[in-house]
Swiss-Prot record:
Source organism: Cereibacter sphaeroides (strain ATCC 17023 / DSM 158 / JCM 6121 / CCUG 31486 / LMG 2827 / NBRC 12203 / NCIMB 8253 / ATH 2.4.1.)
Cofactor: Mg(2+)
Keywords: Cell inner membrane, Cell membrane, Glycosyltransferase, Magnesium, Membrane, Metal-binding, Purine salvage, Transferase
Name of the protein: Xanthine-guanine phosphoribosyltransferase
A single BP term in Gene Ontology: XMP salvage
EC number: 2.4.2.-, 2.4.2.22
Binding site for xanthine: D106, I149
Molecular functions (GO terms): guanine phosphoribosyltransferase activity; hypoxanthine phosphoribosyltransferase activity; magnesium ion binding; xanthine phosphoribosyltransferase activity
Uppermost EC category: transferase
Binding site for GMP: Q79, D106, S107, G108, K109, T110, W148, I149
HAMAP family: XGPRT
An example Gene Ontology CC term for this record: plasma membrane
């Protein structure tokens, strides 16, 4: 079987689609929190999880929002994930009642790292690939492992390299 380049099996996500799918994620999570169905806070994994986290927090009326910044890609190559910025320690504890949101779970390495830090948090992604699916508690759409997802914040009419560099 011929190997495909990432863009040859691409899944292009529009702003409307990420908005709809993020709202669907919020609806699936509604009433599922450990505190009488509520969540204490939403933590978005930056950068890709920022848009879905904002939409989920709005839909569920969760005002406490923080971020964790994990770098696991250098340009288009996956590398060992590292935490660049952690959320407030007082907020997080062991993660109980915290909803951690990302756009995609791919290999699962990012979520695996974050899960070791906050083992009782609930992990939710909009999209999931088979290799990473065991690391996520809730997701909306599964895509094949060899599909490259093109998010609207990464594209113009064609892929555009970030102005300041490659990562």
């Amino acid at each position: 079987m011929k190997e495909r380049l990432p863009h040859e099996k691409g899944f292009h996500v529009s702003w409307d689609q990420i908005h709809r799918d993020s709202r669907a994620l919020a609806w699936r999570l509604d009433g599922q929190g450990p505190d009488n169905g509520s969540w204490r806070a939403v933590v978005g994994i930056t950068r890709g999880g920022l848009v879905p986290a904002m939409i989920v927090s709005r839909e569920l009326d969760i005002r406490t929002v923080d971020t964790i910044s994990v770098k696991s890609y250098n340009w288009q190559e996956q590398q060992a994930p590292t935490v660049i910025k952690a959320p407030q320690a007082e907020l997080m504890g062991d993660g109980h009642g915290i909803l951690i949101v990302d756009d995609l779970v791919d290999s699962g390495k990012t979520l695996e790292l974050v899960r070791t830090l906050y083992p009782r948090a609930h992990f939710a992604t909009v999209y999931a690939k088979p290799s990473g699916r065991p690391m996520v508690d809730t997701y909306i759409t599964e895509v094949s492992q060899d599909t490259w997802i093109f998010f609207p914040w990464d594209m113009a009419l064609q892929y555009v390299e970030p102005y300041r560099g490659r990562d």
